[in-house]
Amino acid sequence: MNFSVVAVALVVVLTVHFTDGQETSSSLPSPPSPLPGRWPWGPKPWHCRPHHHGFTMIYGCEKFSRDMKKEMDALRNNGSESCRTLSTWVEQENCKFEQLMDARSRVVPEEKCLQNMVAFATGITPSTTVTTPTPTTETPTTETPSTP
């Protein structure tokens, strides 16, 4: 009888001690430090990887690349006040990422740069003309019955 009382008391004490220890050690985790060459939210998309050289590799896109890089760096480093008021590091990073994507979609490359980007992606040079056949529909002919 005494053994079972002691065993139950010991289980209760250990459970309470373990539960209290879990609650007091739940401080906010520090933000993860990204590995060099990796974003905190996973690997970079294929078009952002260094071996693709971005837009600088495409003829006529140097100015576009510089302007975009300047704007992206400013957003990446600073974000905006609306992002800084968010409570967690993850929310702040997601907010900055969304602003970065919005800014990227607002940057419109010059026409020549856009043509060269298409040429670079497809392998078709701007001087090559690709003609698509226009669909032709045959008009159905109906025979009129001849009357005798």
Curated annotation (Swiss-Prot):
Contains 2 disulfide bonds. Keywords: Disulfide bond, Ion channel impairing toxin, Secreted, Signal, Toxin. Residues 125-148 are annotated as: Disordered. Expressed by the venom gland. Its main location: secreted. One of its GO terms (cellular component) is extracellular region. Transmembrane segments: none annotated. Residues 22-38 form a propeptide. Residues 1-21 form the signal peptide. GO terms for molecular function: ion channel regulator activity; toxin activity. It is found in: Secreted. Probable ion channel inhibitor. This is U5-hexatoxin-Hi1a. It comes from Hadronyche infensa (Fraser island funnel-web spider).
